[in-house]
Design a protein with these regions (language model features):
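FIC/Doc superfamily catalytic core
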Residues: 1-89
Length: 89
């Protein structure tokens, strides 16, 4: 997931939950961890681990001024659904 994609999710979440993004760096970190590679080798063994890592980052480094656990869970779910659909192609 790109930082831009995660920002789109955040904007929609914020509109529905009357909250705001306060830490754009946290969004970038969470997006980066979802597709992290070292020497071209994925850091995570599978997309479930990548989604969990992204969720952990968003909880540890809150991106919003409130409802961060709910946002982290939603982001991980969207990541899993998106990755699942892409793997079907």
């Amino acid at each position: 997931m790109t930082a831009e994609q995660l920002l789109l999710i955040a904007r929609e979440f914020c509109a529905q939950h009357k909250t705001t993004v306060t830490n754009f760096g946290a969004l970038v970190a969470a997006a980066s961890v979802s597709s992290a590679r070292i020497d071209g080798i994925p850091v995570h063994a599978n997309r479930q681990q990548a989604a969990h890592a992204m969720q952990q980052i968003l909880v540890a480094y809150p991106a919003l001024n409130k409802h961060n656990r709910a946002f982290a869970a939603l982001s991980a779910r969207v990541f899993m659904e998106t990755e699942s659909r892409l793997s079907l192609r």
